[in-house]
Amino acid sequence: MTVSAEIKKPQNTPTRYYGFDAVRIFAALAVVLTHSFALTGFEEDRPIISVGNLNIAPGYLGVCIFFVTSGFLVAQSWGRTSGVREFVRNRFARIWPALTLLIFASVFILGPIVTTVSTGEYFRDKMTLEYLVKNSTLIFGTASKLPGVFVGQPGSSVNGSLWTLPQEIYAYIILASVGLTGLLRRWWGGLLIFTGFVCFWRFGFYAGSGPRGIGFSLSIVNVSFSTALGAWFFAGVALVKIPLRGIKLFIPGVLLTGVAFAVGEPLLFFIGFPMLVIGCGASSPKVLRGLHRIGDPSYGIYIYSFPLQQVLFRYGVATTPVPMFLLAAPLATLLGFASWRFLEHPALIALKRKKPAATIS
């Protein structure tokens, strides 16, 4: 299936923004920080900042940053692709190689080693198959537990980071569906979708007060959280059409975010914080060019860190938040760089060689 001539855009070379690598690494490490409290039994002591009735832990802030930057970069990727098939291939190559390795390693290596049940019972339990299938496909949400794995620990999930990945997939589906209409060619197209998500969130769909889930997210994620993540994603999409980058976007973003905290209005935070994030990301300081050449470990940090932290706690290596973070952060970063170097980047390069005109974000 190809995008019509009205929707297709020229396949130009994208502008290189070196700031996104640092921004996404910061986001991933913020998630590691929050999990360092939750997985050692000190969740109530984790740092929290509040904007009105919106409480924000570093991990949630990191997730917001990931969705904003993803919306910005994936919208640009959509504009450069020749059609839906190419768009799907690009997204598949970015998410599934590392995810597949993680899921199979979790089920067939980590699980049998740390489980408290027999190997036979472990593999016969329907939880094992559910974990493998759900987390490998993502379409119908994720599974969080394996039989006998990490039982009795403050957090019993095998990988509590994966729940956001289906939400990312849903955002891609919405983006492609809207893109096929040609709406994203308009400066107000992404802004319209962003406004819709914010309205769902703002007018009554707060966590715990609305119905549980809609569509594919039924019984998986509370709809208030889904609408919030949709808002962050399409805030990034909307900013593609704003002709401001770097400091020109960063300064108004800082001002709006500051006002949001000062007056306690989450809506201003939804507007200002994405501007701040893209202002940082869409910059090209020379000091970050070296980091860009090394690669982007952020996705690997995000998906590998949680089971790593669980193992560190299980064997008594780190049982309080600060030691956990100081150990898990560099180890997860090393895993992230290794994943990028030997798995994620080769997968993207292989796809580029197959489709020379494609540019993958």
Go through each PLM region and give its residues.
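Membrane-helix interface linkers and caps
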Residues: 7, 74-91, 95, 114-118, ...
